[in-house]
Amino acid sequence: MADVPTGPPRVDRAIDLLWATFHEPPFWAALELWTAARTDPPLRAALRTEEPQLREAIRAVADGIWGPEVTGAPLYEELCELLFTSMRGVVLVYAFEERPPATDPHVALWKRLAARMLFPEGHADSQG
């Protein structure tokens, strides 16, 4: 993302990239493991010990995508939690409904919310 400027344009691009990761095979494999773990105690125990490390690795990649201007924002931690949980929930519809992820109406919403949370003063809302 070296070619993407800082500020809202970078946030828009970061959200596009993060959203795309929720449509890749590794995410769907993880989702299937989580679902199976609900009724498989040994699998649940194994995932419980590994999940924090995976989450930390994913977060490190996300931090690199966002860049230092964004990761230093006071509401960055809250924004990441909001985006990850929201994207994880929204993507479930794609398990049974084929549609282009880039046109999902949530993408524009996430971009507007991110701009408001990260740049509350002096930056226009991103329109996505």
Stretches with model-predicted labels:
Residues 2-6, 38, 42, 70:
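Residues in soluble alpha-helical coiled-coils and helical-bundle/repeat scaffolds
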